[in-house]
Structures are given as C-alpha cells and as structure tokens.
C-alpha cells in the first residue's frame, strides 16, 4: 500500500497537488466558455491562470513529497486540454472560423500537436538516452509556452485595436507555425536548468516583482514582451545546446 494511503484513505497532503492540477484544467475549460461569449480578455486570463497553476502543481508535489503516477497522468491530460484544446478553440472562435475551409484544420493542428508533444514527453520520461534533457534543455516548445505564443495575434489586437491582427490568414499561418514548434526537436531552455549567480539574486527578485506589477497594470503589453523574448531565446537555446554537445564530444575524445 502507498505510504500516502492508509485505512482511512488518502491524506490531504497527497491531494493538494492534484487539486491544483484539476483547477488548472477547470481554468482551461472556463477559457473556452468565455471565448464562446466573446470575452477575449477574460478567456486569455483563464488560460494564463492555468499556466500559473501548472507551474505550481509539480513544485508543490515535490515539496510535499506527494508525487504519484496518477498525478503525472492527470497533469498531462490537464495540459492537453488547457494548453492545446482550449487555445485552439479560442483562436478558432476569435479569428479562424472566418477562414473559408482551413481555419478549423489550423485549430486542429494546434490541439493535435500539443497532444503529440505531451505523448512524446511521457514516452521518453524514463528513457535512458535523452540528449536534450541531460544537457538541461526541453525538446520542442512546452505546451504552456506554446499556448502563450499562439496568442500573440490576440495580444497585438488587444494592445493596438487593429483588426488586421485578427485576419484569418496571418492567424492561421501563425497557429500552424506554433504547432510545428511544439512537436519539433529543437532544444529550448528549461526553467529548471537556469541558475542565477548569487550576486544577481536581488536584481532577479526586483525584476520578478516589476514583472508581476507589469502583468497587473499592462498585462497584454507585458505578455507580448515575454512572448517575443521567448521567441528570441529559441535560436539562442539552439546555439547553446550545440556548444554543450561540442564540449561533451571534446571531453569524450580526450577520455579516449
């Protein structure tokens, strides 16, 4: 019997991370409901909140020592809905439904590629040979980041009020591009591998505080900035990964 389970059932400590994951799932579905009603800002806010909760559940599970196979499966299913299905439907309702034939196909591509990315992650989680992970990188764009990037046209529309950003042609092309990034084999930075120098800690904390304030005061400009920064980091991550692999190759050559 699992140590978290006794004759009286499962402990509250074991349920907390799963409750957070379930709440993230609810936020994703709520985003779709808000999108159906045309409440675009609130719809995006629900998906963003789902992303925050998704970032917390695993860390809280490790902190409480409450990791479980059930929690991992629930997290994957929640991510698929909150960052694949829900963003695809929101983009379709906001713009892609105006495409004569291919708008729904683009929305499907985003949802399906998110599912495929998560399936690949689950299939490789126990694999012995994972070059990207061993070097501190993700493989492809993670699902929450992919959802945030897919919403860039909506950020631009909310910031500028320009309906050109809502035209289905560029939105469809952008949606397909993000779908491809999610299932790509490109190395991308993993937050768990980022280390901050001791003498930069206070600056980092101040930056996080300012970022939080910016998200409250000017959320769409801030999210647009963060999404653009993430896009710029993709080629940097690729170059950094190549350097790591070259150093490893040189070290193996010296060892021989």
Where are these regions (language model features)?
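C-terminal ends of transmembrane helices
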Residues: 59-68, 115-133, 183-192, 239-242
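Hydrophobic, membrane-inserted alpha-helices
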Residues: 26-30, 86-88, 205-213
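Helix-coil boundary and interhelical linker segments in multi-pass alpha-helical membrane proteins
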Residues: 30-45, 81, 85-108, 151-171, ...
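Alpha-helical transmembrane segments of polytopic integral membrane proteins
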Residues: 29-32, 49, 53, 87, ...
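C-terminal membrane-associated helical module and adjoining short loops/tails
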Residues: 1-5, 135-256
């Amino acid at each position: 019997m699992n140590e978290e389970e006794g004759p009286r059932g499962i402990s509250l400590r074991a349920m907390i991370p799963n409750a957070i994951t379930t709440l993230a799932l609810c936020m994703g579905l709520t985003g779709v409901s808000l999108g159906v009603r045309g409440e675009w800002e609130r719809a995006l806010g629900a998906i963003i909140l789902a992303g925050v909760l998704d970032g917390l559940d695993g860390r809280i599970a490790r902190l409480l020592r409450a990791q479980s196979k059930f929690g991992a499966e629930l997290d994957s299913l929640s991510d698929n809905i909150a960052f694949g299905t829900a963003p695809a439907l929101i983009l379709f309702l906001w713009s892609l439904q105006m495409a004569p034939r291919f708008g729904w196909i683009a929305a499907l591509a985003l949802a399906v590629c998110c599912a495929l990315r998560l399936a690949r992650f689950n299939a490789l989680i126990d694999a012995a040979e994972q070059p990207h992970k061993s070097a501190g990188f993700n493989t492809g764009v993670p699902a929450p980041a992919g959802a945030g990037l897919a919403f860039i046209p909506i950020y631009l529309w909310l910031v500028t009020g320009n309906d050109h950003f809502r035209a289905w042609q560029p939105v469809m092309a952008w949606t397909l591009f993000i779908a491809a990034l999610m299932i790509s084999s490109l190395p991308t930075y993993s937050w768990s591998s980022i280390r901050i120098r001791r003498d930069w800690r206070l600056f980092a904390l101040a930056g996080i505080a300012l970022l939080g304030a910016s998200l409250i005061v000017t959320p769409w400009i801030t999210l647009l900035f963060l999404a653009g920064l993430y896009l710029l980091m993709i080629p940097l991550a690729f170059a950094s990964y190549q350097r790591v692999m070259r150093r490893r190759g040189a070290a193996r050559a010296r060892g021989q």
